[in-house]
Amino acid sequence: MASVAKTGAEALRNAPFRVGKKQIFLPNHVITFVRPLPKQPPNLATFIVPLEFNKLDLRDYLYHVYNVEVTGVRSFVNQRMHEQRHGDVGNWRRPKSQKMMIAELAKPFVWPKPPAEDAREAFDYAMWKKQKTAQEQDTKFQGIRAQGEVVPPSQFEVTKDRKAIKARQSKFLSGEETWAPGKVNAFLNSKIVPEEEGWSEVEENLPLDESAESAAEESSSKGSETRQ
């Protein structure tokens, strides 16, 4: 512990600029390092900082925590657009403003390139893309409904799951397959859920656990006794 304090004191003495003397323990500030724009030079770093932050706070923070020397800091506040409190309903309000700072680094920093599509598959990137597409589509239709227009079902994208459910429904109606009450859902099989999505095969018509059935019977019998 003494060596750490000694190192910190030595760093303060060797600082190329005058640093603040006020010590802050366990701060709750959130500082976000933002990926730069395509043509932004590598000696400029962009951060999202709290509104009460000033330029000296960011300069001292980068120097004390990451040992990064900063030669200058520029700050600006982004005013948010008006929006409704609950999506497309509720009172109109202006969200809290966002403060950003651009620090001029003494040593340039180059961001690493984003990983390729193949490398992202290990982090469930395919599912993330599906969720993002569904969220964008839902936001689009919410905006249309907010203007008083009706969105017909024909404009919704037909997913693989809906196509598979429709195919299984036609088999049930034609009599090719029969529904089995008390069994595992027949939709959870390798035909409906593709293997490339990471799902394992589930056996059809697999009986439920006997312990679960007995527990359900006991709860139903207790409920009938209570009513009597």
From Swiss-Prot:
Predominant location: mitochondrion
Biased composition (Acidic residues): 195-216
Superkingdom per UniProt: Eukaryota
This protein's GO CC annotations: mitochondrial large ribosomal subunit
GO biological process, one term: mitochondrial translation
InterPro entries reported for this sequence: Nucleotide-bd_a/b_plait_sf, Ribosomal_uL23-like, Ribosomal_uL23/eL15/eS24_sf
Subcellular location(s) per record: Mitochondrion
Subunit structure: Component of the mitochondrial large ribosomal subunit (mt-LSU). Mature N.crassa 74S mitochondrial ribosomes consist of a small (37S) and a large (54S) subunit. The 37S small subunit contains a 16S ribosomal RNA (16S mt-rRNA) and 32 different proteins. The 54S large subunit contains a 23S rRNA (23S mt-rRNA) and 42 different proteins. uL23m forms the wall of the exit tunnel.
Family per record: Belongs to the universal ribosomal protein uL23 family.
Keywords noted in UniProt: Mitochondrion, Ribonucleoprotein, Ribosomal protein
Coiled-coil segments: none
Residue numbers spanned by region Disordered: 194-228
Pfam families named among the record's database cross-references: Ribosomal_L23
Keyword check for Ribosomal protein: yes
Organism: Neurospora crassa (strain ATCC 24698 / 74-OR23-1A / CBS 708.71 / DSM 1257 / FGSC 987)
Lineage of origin: Eukaryota, Fungi, Dikarya, Ascomycota, Pezizomycotina
Protein name per the record: Large ribosomal subunit protein uL23m
Molecular function terms from GO: structural constituent of ribosome
